[in-house]
């Protein structure tokens, strides 16, 4: 995408390099993609998989997005500002400044958070370049330096892999942060898992044993609420016929993808009560 190498340090101020980071407004992953932007750039998000949390896929998506922003603004400082507050806010700041496309000229018209964002990015780049001059020592990663990616075409739980291959479950989660519930839903479509290179051949040889290990316990089918499902559709999927006037889901306003809900029969209306009473009197 022909973007400056220094932009690799952007996740330092976005997420502190935490692939599972979630902001108060729902931005997720190393690059803090909002749901709509992530989907625009090809990142899959559902109740089991959130590719915004995949460091590799999210980095490709971020590079694509940053490249697109540069085509709009033609200045990397403005691109970085737009990455933080959105291109619409940067355009407003440009208009209020009289049409200038210099970051420091539009600085007073940017949102407060964004005014500190570009300086923070400059500071992060300085730190990553000159850390040794300030006696800053990098921490060594506890994750394996060499990994490989395997495509899986069946449902597998990370605990199945950990149990059979003897890999630490937290290490597996760190290598595969995109799986929100530790489930790789390969039966729906092939998904990739990352393993320490030393364990790849054993995984290939023992895949059937891994798939059968505690399968009934770890891969029990659970009904999930999809984002676009309304309540009657949700119960139709679970093979129950539901009429919305007879049933209601409690606290529906808090439902989201993957959430569980309770349903209870609503009280009969006064008109129905009166009609039932008249019916009994006629008998």
Name each model-derived stretch.
Residues 1-16, 63-67:
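Export/targeting segments at the very N-terminus of extracytoplasmic proteins
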Residues 4-12, 28, 76-81:
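Alpha-helical scaffolds flanking conserved acidic
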């Amino acid at each position: 995408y022909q973007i400056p190498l220094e932009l690799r340090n952007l996740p330092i101020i976005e997420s502190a390099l935490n692939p599972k980071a979630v902001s108060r407004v729902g931005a997720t992953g190393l690059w803090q993609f909002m749901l709509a932007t992530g989907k625009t750039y090809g990142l899959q998000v559902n109740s089991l998989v959130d590719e915004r949390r995949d460091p590799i896929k999210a980095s490709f998506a971020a590079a694509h997005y940053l490249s697109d922003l540069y085509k709009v603004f033609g200045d990397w400082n403005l691109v970085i500002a737009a990455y933080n507050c959105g291109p619409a806010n940067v355009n407003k700041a440009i208009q209020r400044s009289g049409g200038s496309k210099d970051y420091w000229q539009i600085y007073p018209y940017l949102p407060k958070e964004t005014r500190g964002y570009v300086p923070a990015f400059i500071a992060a780049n300085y730190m990553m370049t000159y850390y040794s001059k300030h006696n800053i020592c990098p921490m060594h990663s506890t994750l394996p330096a060499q990994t490989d990616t395997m495509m899986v075409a069946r449902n597998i739980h990370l605990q199945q892999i950990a149990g059979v291959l003897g890999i630490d479950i937290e290490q597996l989660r760190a290598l595969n942060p995109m799986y929100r519930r530790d489930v790789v839903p390969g039966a729906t479509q092939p998904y990739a898992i990352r393993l320490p290179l030393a364990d790849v051949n054993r995984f290939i040889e023992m895949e059937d044993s891994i798939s059968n290990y505690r399968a009934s316990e770890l891969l029990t089918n659970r009904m999930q609420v999809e984002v676009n499902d309304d309540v009657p559709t949700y119960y139709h999927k679970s093979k129950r016929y539901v009429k919305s006037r007879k049933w209601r889901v409690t606290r529906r306003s808090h439902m989201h993808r993957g959430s569980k809900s309770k349903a209870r029969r609503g009280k009969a209306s006064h008109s129905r009560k009166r009609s039932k009473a008249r019916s009994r009197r006629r008998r």
